């Protein structure tokens, strides 16, 4: 088992719409430093890193004077790429993870398979979240982007990710429950299992 592997990654991405830098350590303690210019997204990424026990630094500059959409989605792309790189050969990991997370009246569930086959399912959000906006002192966060964030994360990390809202009323609570559920599912999936001596697949590769 490659338990002493350096499971860290640094990924940078620059386009005409954004500049993103992500540093990720899968074997961290939840130390986070997030600055995207979209305050609620900063809050969600802080929760993600903290509850996954990842050390996570995200610095992003984007065209938030137009809207935060580009910055949020591009950050999710880079975070997914960093996760995929940090996983390395995947030897010794649990591979699968899932978590139910309540946030007051809301309940979300996330399930992860570090399979090397990207797939994404997102169900259960109330229709009202398509048009809901969480305002802040910086660029607003539109909850319609939740799906895009998790989809970009899944496909760029090459994982299968299912996220569902079982019930809820407050879009803030629903969104936060989803991010925390993804965090805890990822934490479980990437953890080392002392009983796994190689790649956790009957094919011998992920």
From Swiss-Prot:
The disulfide bonds in this chain are: none
Q: Which GO terms describe its molecular function?
A: imidazoleglycerol-phosphate dehydratase activity
Where in the cell? Answer: Cytoplasm
Matching Gene3D superfamilies: Imidazole glycerol phosphate dehydratase, domain 1
Give EC number(s), comma-separated.
4.2.1.19
Q: Which reaction does it catalyse?
A: D-erythro-1-(imidazol-4-yl)glycerol 3-phosphate = 3-(imidazol-4-yl)-2-oxopropyl phosphate + H2O
Keyword set includes Cytoplasm: yes
What is the name of this protein? Imidazoleglycerol-phosphate dehydratase
What is the organism field in this record? Mycolicibacterium smegmatis (strain ATCC 700084 / mc(2)155)
Q: What is the lineage of its organism?
A: Bacteria, Bacillati, Actinomycetota, Actinomycetes, Mycobacteriales
């Amino acid at each position: 088992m490659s338990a002493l592997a350096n499971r860290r990654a640094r990924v940078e991405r620059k386009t005409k719409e954004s500049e993103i830098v992500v540093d990720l350590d899968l074997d961290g303690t939840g130390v986070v430093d997030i600055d995207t210019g979209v305050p609620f997204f900063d809050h969600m990424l802080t929760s993600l890193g903290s509850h996954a026990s990842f050390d996570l630094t995200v610095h992003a500059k984007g065209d938030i004077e137009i809207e935060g959409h580009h910055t949020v989605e591009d950050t999710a792309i880079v975070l997914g790429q960093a996760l995929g790189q940090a996983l390395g050969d995947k030897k010794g990991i649990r591979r699968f993870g899932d978590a139910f997370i309540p946030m007051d009246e809301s309940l979300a569930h996330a399930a992860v398979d570090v399979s090397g086959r990207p797939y994404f399912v997102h169900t259960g959000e109330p229709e009202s979240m398509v048009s809901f906006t969480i305002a802040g002192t910086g660029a607003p966060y539109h909850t319609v982007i939740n799906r895009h964030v998790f989809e970009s994360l899944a496909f760029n990390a090459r994982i299968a990710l299912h996220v569902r809202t079982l019930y809820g009323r407050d879009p803030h609570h629903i969104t936060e429950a989803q991010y925390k559920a993804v965090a805890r599912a990822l934490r479980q999936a990437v953890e080392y299992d002392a009983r796994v001596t190689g790649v956790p697949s009957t094919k011998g590769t992920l």
